[in-house]
């Protein structure tokens, strides 16, 4: 695989395939099913096109509230803004 040419302008970067996430849940009958098959809800091109961040999944606490897919709704609606060390990456 070769390095991208020039700054990154889209996600995924030119020449790279989509990252895939597979999240499971339960249907009304209690059977395990796939809830999503995508590449995440939050992508950021950073450092003037030299890097890309892709947040695959995040939660609001521990233990994770998985009832009625509350964790998936939270991850979709709340982009991660702080990481270890409280560095604000996405402003």
UniProtKB/Swiss-Prot annotation:
This enzyme's EC code(s):
1.-.-.-
Query: Which pathway does this polypeptide act in?
Result: Secondary metabolite biosynthesis
Q: What would be an example GO MF term here?
A: oxidoreductase activity
Indicate yes or no for the key word Oxidoreductase. yes
Q: Which UniProt keywords apply?
A: Oxidoreductase
Q: What does this protein do?
A: Highly reducing polyketide synthase; part of the gene cluster that mediates the biosynthesis of annullatin D, an alkylated aromatic polyketide with a fused dihydrobenzofuran lactone ring system that exhibits potent agonistic activities toward the cannabinoid receptors.
Concerning its family, UniProt says: Belongs to the virC family.
Q: What is this protein called?
A: Oxidoreductase anuC
What organism does this protein naturally occur in?
Penicillium roqueforti (strain FM164)
Supply the gene name: anuC
